[in-house]
Amino acid sequence: QNIENFEKYNVKKIITQCPHCLTTLKNDYAEIGVELEVIHHSELIADLIKNEKIQPEATIEDDITFHDACYVGRHHGEYDAPRQILQSVLKDSSSLKEMPRNKEQSFCCGAGGGNMWYEIKQGKRINVERFEEAIDTGAKKVATSCNFCMIMMEDGKKVTGQDKNMEVFDIAELVAERI
């Protein structure tokens, strides 16, 4: 049904917010002969900023850390666009505080492994371990580029008692609030 609609409306390009949809549309659909240009919203936003189509104000003074979504980063190799976006909204470029495990070595939030839908009975939950890494950066804000990662980071924030101390955002929110 999707393919029929793509053909009916002559769809050539799709922009996704969800990294899992990015993978499905870009890779899986290509395997069955569907030719589409598929990009993640971080690529679009970074391109709009680079080409001065949008100009967010650099108003964030707090330190911020970025969680690389597995399906944007390791599966598609996109690490620069989200960081370029963050640099565009930070007053000081040194306010971006990387977690020790970032980019190619980033640690999964757990959503892709199904941890969002069940309760771990023993050991530390993956999203809590990842959120503790965010806490250790000293940042007051955590940004990501995946709807599932946001859910996991929000849960990690609550479990670690950081509800009042830290905020979780999608990178698009940070830009939208500043244009």
Residue ranges and their predicted role:
Residues Q1-I179:
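Iron-sulfur cluster-binding electron-transfer modules in prokaryotic oxidoreductases
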